[in-house]
């Protein structure tokens, strides 16, 4: 609808999420965009020197003529994403985490280096970030802490977006592997978003500093990381809109659904497929406009055209 923007800030949106999952599994344009950008940005955050064009070259032509470890990790990230899609409906386990990390490091110089213990958990202490690095779980405690983490979140049932982010913080603070923890953890977040009907996202390298600050300050100010990742969600939702993933969710369909909440920035309404959040760029939805979503949408459109 002209004059409105649909975003999904962690709400359950089962119908649209089914579409996103199907688009990715079917290797459509959204799949290609996600593969290239996810591999490029997630590896770049961890120090890869590959350009975006080189990442595309590896994806399209399997060209590994650049720095071998960087090229292999880009190629492996594509394979890791495919593995995640193949197992998206399976519960997360320690064994799956290990398999994810093994796929990422396969064929690299790390694979046969006993210091990195690829195929198992870390054997020496590590940290997050190169500058102002903060400590992580000791190697001897990794399995115990992972067991506790998995049990805690499995007991929650359906996870909210904040639950998924909290799980990621806990996983990164454990830092269970010798290398590749950030990329493995971000792939787990993508999987958990698809599993729990939350819009997934690709963390952009430009926001690396905000991401690391959010991880470090989570206990004191959750909004640092939440706001950073909610912004990434908005970017991915916009990409989905460009590929017409949400094209059938127009005013005619939404007009039949019940508004359950509203404030100065959004209308939250309920459908048979879950909760939707319609954002209208700071347009206030008045009390008299809450009878049905059709009136609210027409009001937003009218206000933005005046």
Question: Which residues fall in each region the model found?
Answer:
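FIC/Doc superfamily catalytic core
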Residues: 1-179, 183-306
């Amino acid at each position: 609808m002209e004059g409105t923007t649909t975003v999904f800030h962690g709400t359950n949106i089962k119908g649209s999420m089914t579409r996103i999952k199907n688009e990715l599994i079917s290797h459509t344009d959204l799949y290609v965009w996600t593969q290239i950008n996810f591999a490029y940005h997630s590896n770049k955050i961890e120090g890869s020197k590959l350009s975006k064009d080189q990442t595309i070259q590896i994806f399209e032509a399997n060209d590994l003529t650049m720095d071998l470890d960087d090229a292999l990790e880009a190629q492996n990230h594509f394979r890791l994403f495919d593995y995640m899609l193949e197992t998206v409906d399976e519960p997360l386990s320690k064994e799956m985490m290990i398999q994810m990390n093994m796929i990422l490091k396969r064929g690299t110089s790390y694979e046969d280096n006993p210091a990195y213990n690829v195929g198992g958990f870390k054997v020496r202490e590590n940290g997050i970030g190169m500058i102002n690095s903060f400590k992580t779980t000791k190697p001897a405690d990794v399995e115990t802490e992972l067991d506790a983490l998995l049990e805690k979140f499995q007991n929650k049932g359906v996870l909210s977006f904040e639950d998924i982010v909290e799980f990621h913080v806990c996983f990164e603070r454990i830092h269970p592997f010798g290398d590749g923890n950030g990329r493995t953890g971000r792939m787990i977040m993508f999987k958990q978003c698809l599993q729990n009907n939350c819009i997934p996202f690709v963390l952009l390298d430009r926001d690396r500093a905000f991401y690391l600050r959010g991880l470090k300050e989570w206990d004191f100010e959750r909004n640092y990381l939440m706001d950073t990742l909610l912004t990434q969600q908005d970017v991915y939702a916009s990409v989905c809109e460009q590929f017409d993933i949400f094209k059938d969710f127009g005013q005619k369909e939404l007009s039949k659904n019940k508004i359950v909440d509203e404030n100065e920035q959004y209308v939250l309404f309920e459908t048979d497929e879950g909760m939707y959040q319609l954002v209208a760029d700071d347009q206030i939805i008045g009390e008299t406009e809450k009878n049905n979503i059709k009136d609210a949408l027409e009001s937003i459109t009218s206000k933005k055209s005046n």
